[in-house]
From Swiss-Prot:
It is found in: Plastid, Chloroplast thylakoid membrane. Belongs to the ATPase alpha/beta chains family. The record marks 363 as: Required for activity. This is ATP synthase subunit alpha, chloroplastic. The gene is atpA. Keywords: ATP synthesis, ATP-binding, CF(1), Chloroplast, Hydrogen ion transport, Ion transport, Membrane, Nucleotide-binding, Plastid, Thylakoid, Translocase, Transport. F-type ATPases have 2 components, CF(1) - the catalytic core - and CF(0) - the membrane proton channel. CF(1) has five subunits: alpha(3), beta(3), gamma(1), delta(1), epsilon(1). CF(0) has four main subunits: a, b, b' and c. InterPro entries: ATP_synth_asu-like_sf, ATP_synth_asu_C, ATP_synth_asu_C_sf, ATP_synth_F1_a_nt-bd_dom, ATP_synth_F1_asu, ATPase_a/bsu_AS, ATPase_F1/V1/A1_a/bsu_N, ATPase_F1/V1/A1_a/bsu_N_sf. It is an enzyme of class 7 (translocase). It comes from Silene latifolia (White campion).
């Protein structure tokens, strides 16, 4: 018979008491009243925060957007096909956040920062809130460094600086994405991290852009955030904020970043869909009342950090689509008022073969020449005025039969300048090449050539200058000034190349 010793029993009881875990886990739960169209109505969830993540029984995540007196309106981050009426929901106590790290470079991810390129998981050790406050006034400094796009029309007349927000606006199929992707290609070797956010686009279009980046070696410094047209509205609405959080991660590490939102019209439409389904009152064009805040809180995150914060920068190029050139619609006017200028792409110019189809007359950069190197200021100062006068003259010349010699000369010069601004896609130019091109046009060296010969001559001149007068490029890149020596070298090269070119044409 086993004898029971009292001291052993007391030891066992004491051990049990010591191991007893008094921690009580409180979970805030609710039940689904109604679900459908990417929206769920939840009863309960008494202490849920606005924007808090909630988790359904079958693991779908949602965001609590509407906090009403008797229920909570939740938008789903998934199809939610397995969610049933009466199933339970629990609040997670977290606001939407994503993991961030340098390992995201070269990857294609979705709005939840999950990789969708089939190249495995991304290792991260840090996370950032998707929505974080924009830098304050003290944390910023004024924009002073240029961010070269590689497009002559933009870098000479509508310059963009690091930390600026410049809107790209135009009808569908006018080359808006091409301007943005060319800008990314031109950042090669410039130590700029690029984030391309595709919102509500065709998967084939996004694949095309990614392939082009890979072929040109641009994916090394680029992150693509993609939510295609078949994604839930919630994810299309979140995608730009995810991109901004990734760009901010690098900005606060004293790096320069460029972020492209392609396009914010689709994000506004996704937000409108969510708001109407949540029964929020519609306003102008059926958009909810806070659609301005939707874009302002996103674009205000782009900044040039002060020297105290390491002078990093985040440059934003939002894209907005217009309907038959109507810039006075709701979303275009909102975004124009938030940004520091706009590049207007015209369908008429595009169809007339002027590409990039930038309407220089109504495009503007509110940073202006502060975002240009001295050499570009010296050369391009008169260009915008000359083109504006030419456009006016051209309209007038359609009605006049006999024009005086001076007017004819001005028209001829304008036609050649317009020819210089044409550029094939995915062929960005260096600043030195742009300066050479503009100088050649504005100083009348092309006036003797036929319009059809202008581009051929300029291409040959670029090659000639590179091989025979390489000092020109060195002077501009080192001094950032169009010195007398550089001008003499360029004049020499133009004259030598012009002689060769005319001989070739005669042969």
């Amino acid at each position: 018979m086993v004898t029971i010793r009292a001291d052993e029993i007391s030891n066992i009881i004491r051990e049990r008491i010591e191991k007893y875990n008094r921690e009580v886990k409180v979970v805030n739960t609710g039940t689904v009243l109604q679900v459908g169209d990417g929206i769920a109505r939840i009863h309960g969830l008494d202490e849920v925060m606005a924007g808090e993540l909630v988790e359904f029984e079958e693991r779908t995540i949602g965001i609590a957007l509407n906090l009403e007196s008797n229920n909570v309106g939740v938008v789903l981050m998934g199809d939610g096909l397995l969610i049933q009426e009466g199933s339970s929901v629990k609040a997670t106590g977290r606001i939407a956040q994503i993991p961030v790290s340098d390992a995201y470079l070269g990857r294609v991810i979705n709005a939840l920062a999950k990789p969708i390129d089939g190249r495995g998981e991304i290792s991260t050790s840090e996370s950032r809130l998707i929505e974080s406050p924009a830098p304050g006034i003290i944390s910023r400094r004024s924009v002073y460094e240029p961010l070269q796009t590689g497009l002559i029309a933009i870098d000479s007349m509508i310059p963009i600086g690091r930390g600026q927000r410049e809107l790209i606006i135009g009808d569908r199929q006018t080359g808006k994405t091409a301007v943005a992707t060319d800008t990314i290609l031109n950042q090669q070797g410039q130590n700029v991290i690029c984030v391309y956010v595709a919102i509500g686009q065709k998967a084939s279009s996004v694949a095309q852009v990614v392939n082009m980046f890979q072929e040109r070696g641009a994916m090394e410094y680029t992150i693509v955030v993609a939510e295609t047209a078949d994604s839930p509205a919630t994810l299309q609405y979140l995608a730009p904020y995810t991109g901004a959080a990734l760009a901010e991660y690098f900005m606060y590490r004293e790096r320069h970043t460029l972020i492209i939102y392609d396009d914010l019209s689709k994000q506004a439409q996704a937000y409108r869909q969510m708001s109407l389904l949540l029964r929020r009152p519609p306003g102008r064009e059926a958009y909810p009342g806070d659609v301005f805040y939707l874009h302002s809180r996103l674009l205000e995150r782009a900044a040039k950090s002060s020297s105290f914060l390491g002078e990093g920068s985040m440059t934003a190029l939002p894209i907005v689509e217009t309907q038959s050139g109507d810039v006075s619609a709701y979303i275009p006017t909102n975004v124009i008022s938030i940004t520091d200028g706009q590049i207007f792409l015209s369908a008429d110019l595009f169809n007339a073969g002027i590409r990039p189809a930038i309407n220089v007359g109504i495009s503007v950069s509110r940073v202006g020449s502060a975002a240009q190197i001295k050499a570009m200021k010296q050369v391009a100062g008169k260009l915008k005025l000359e083109l504006a006068q030419f456009a006016e003259l051209e309209a007038f010349a359609q009605f006049a039969s006999d024009l005086d010699k001076a007017t004819q000369n001005q028209l001829a010069r304008g036609q050649r300048l317009r020819e210089l601004l044409k550029q094939p896609q995915s062929a960005p130019l260096t600043v030195e090449e742009q300066i050479m091109t503009i100088y050649t046009g504005t100083n009348g060296y092309l006036d003797s050539l036929e319009i059809g010969q202008v581009r051929k001559f300029i291409v040959e001149l670029r090659t000639y200058l590179k091989t025979n007068k390489s000092q020109f490029q060195e002077i501009i890149s080192s001094t950032k000034t169009f010195t007398e020596e550089a001008e003499a070298l360029l004049k020499e090269a133009i004259q030598e190349q012009m002689e060769r070119f005319l001989l070739q044409e005669q042969a």
